[in-house]
UniProtKB/Swiss-Prot annotation:
One of its GO terms (cellular component) is endoplasmic reticulum. This is GDP-fucose protein O-fucosyltransferase 4. Its main location: endoplasmic reticulum. Glycans are attached at N151, N303, N406, N428, N456, N480. Pathway: Protein modification; protein glycosylation. Residues 22-483 are lumenal. One of its GO terms (molecular function) is alpha-(1->3)-fucosyltransferase activity. The chain crosses the membrane at residues 2-21. The keyword RNA-binding does not apply. It is a single-pass type II membrane protein. Protein O-fucosyltransferase that specifically catalyzes O-fucosylation of serine or threonine residues in EMI domains of target proteins. Attaches fucose through an O-glycosidic linkage. O-fucosylation of EMI domain-containing proteins may be required for facilitating protein folding and secretion.
Length: 483
């Protein structure tokens, strides 16, 4: 048992095949009252073509959704899911945490808190992470010691087990939609006084520090800024309730489509993190000026469909390029060629949209929450079957192989200033005081939680004590035994 706990350091599910799993056999680990109703959970109407699972509910493995704010079923807190190859019971009832049939706990990344983690972590349980949102929501997951706590992942990174990279792109047709406003009309609005560039943002203090970049860019080119951030122009009264730029209200979309260029600046910088800020301008037939994912070029329709901030050495150089493009209709229209199907030449994009098993507003496919849930269900049934076979005949059947996430499943870099080196940022700057500190404090919490798990602690409130102990060891020049 001690060996199993120690190996959580590098193989958090190394004890899949060990006798420690029998911890769940004693009565204290079987809160039967919580399971009484679960045995009679409703049966889903869909069963995958490869699913011939004959087991009744009382024999199925249980998946526990840990977040109190997220359970992708309605109504109730328990459901039977019949997936592509196998079936599970899924629940949000935390009373089953220590039950021996609870095979995996699914966490929603934004809500995951080290000081609320389900401890002790049982050797027979896996942890699954679903995190489709910004890296800024939980930097604990961007550190290697944090992401290694999970066995299955669904994130915006293509390297995750269940990638959500194109979650903000509903379909190929979304890109191919006709240009909302013709170039001739856009030029008319330019002559009427609109700036060439639109900035629509009301979430100001973010890790990417985009406002600092926009402030510098404004020195060299005219930008109409309608949101709360760097506002220099009021929205029409009929659009005031859409000032956060998250709405696809028809009138709002028509208004912003007048602009030839849209500043598309993500709130966090991380490979493969791309949101509606990129895809919406392209849907409308506007040219995005993009800063966010460092790998965005891997997913664009072709090599001439967006202006990438990182391709320019200075904001002034970028401004000069935009000004020239604003005056050249032929060159500008080259950026919209992807509106013709044959001009979408990026096979990775085409294959990514075609092969993803989940859909966006597509009734023929599951949403990505239920899709990931079934992914975990099938993987857990595979693991449990392999463990059973190994126990029955160890010589003939290999034990299930431990699986652990790594930094490529999420890892995002330390936030950096939107413009200029960090040394040029004033010490009392709100961005400097917030986001770099949050990034490193999240590392402290990740190391603290890993220490709690490794020491088989059952009380998450002891997190701060473990963090302090790690800090003291580091200050004394001792190695950190959590790594």
């Amino acid at each position: 048992m001690a060996l199993c706990l120690w190996l959580f350091l590098v193989l958090p599910i190394c004890c899949w095949c060990q006798g420690a799993v029998d911890l769940g056999d004693s009565g204290v680990f079987q809160p039967q009252s919580a399971l009484t109703d679960m045995e009679f959970a409703s049966v889903s109407t869909y069963r995958g073509p490869g699913n011939t699972d004959p087991r009744p509910n009382k024999e199925l493995p249980i998946l526990l959704w840990w977040s109190s704010n997220l359970f992708p079923h309605f109504p109730g807190d328990t459901e039977r899911v019949d997936c592509a190859h196998s079936s599970c019971l899924v629940t949000s009832n935390r009373k089953v945490q220590l039950y021996r049939r609870t095979a995996s706990i699914i966490f929603y990344g934004t809500d995951f808190r080290a000081y609320e983690a389900p401890l002790p972590r049982l050797p027979h349980q896996t942890w699954a992470l679903f995190h489709e949102e910004s890296p800024m929501n939980n930097y604990l997951l961007s550190h290697s010691v944090g992401i290694r706590l999970f066995n299955y992942t669904a994130t915006f990174r293509r390297e995750s087990d269940y990638p959500l990279t194109l979650q903000w792109l509903p379909s190929l047709d979304y890109l191919l939609a006709p240009t909302a406003i013709s170039l001739q009309e856009k030029n008319h609005w330019r002559q009427a006084g609109l700036a060439p560039v639109l900035y629509m943002q009301s979430h100001c203090d973010v890790p990417s520090d985009r406002d600092r970049f926009v402030q510098e860019l404004m020195k060299y080119i005219e930008i109409d800024s309608y949101g709360k951030c760097l506002n220099n122009k009021p929205l029409p009264e009929y659009l005031e309730d859409t000032s956060t730029a998250t709405s696809e209200d028809r009138r709002f979309m028509s208004f912003v489509a007048r602009y030839k260029f849209h500043l598309a600046l993500e709130n966090g910088l991380c490979p493969d993190y791309m949101t509606e800020k990129l895809w919406r301008p392209m849907h409308q037939g506007c040219v995005p000026i993009y800063r966010g994912s460092t790998t965005v070029a891997d997913w664009l329709p072709n090599n001439h469909s967006a202006i990438l901030v990182e391709d320019f050495s200075t904001p002034r150089e970028l401004a000069d390029f935009i000004k020239a493009l604003d005056q050249d209709d032929v060159e500008y229209l080259r950026y919209l060629k992807y509106k013709t199907p044959s001009e979408i030449t990026n096979l990775r994009l085409l294959e990514g949209l075609e092969s993803r098993e989940w859909g966006v507003n597509d009734m023929s496919k599951p949403n990505y929450l239920n899709g990931f849930e079934c992914f975990v269900c099938d993987k857990e049934n595979e693991r449990l079957a392999a463990r059973k076979a190994h126990r029955k005949n160890p010589k003939q059947n290999q034990p299930p192989q431990p699986k652990m996430a790594n930094s490529s499943h999420m890892g995002c870099p330390l936030p950096s200033p939107g413009y200029g080196p960090v040394e040029n940022v004033e010490p009392n700057d709100s961005w400097l005081q917030m986001w770099p500190q949050d990034y490193w404090q999240s590392l402290d919490q990740a190391e603290g939680l890993e220490s709690l798990i490794r020491h088989n602690v059952s009380e998450p409130s002891l997190l701060w004590q473990h963090i302090q102990s790690i800090a003291v060891r580091r200050a004394r020049g001792l190695s950190n035994d959590s790594r």
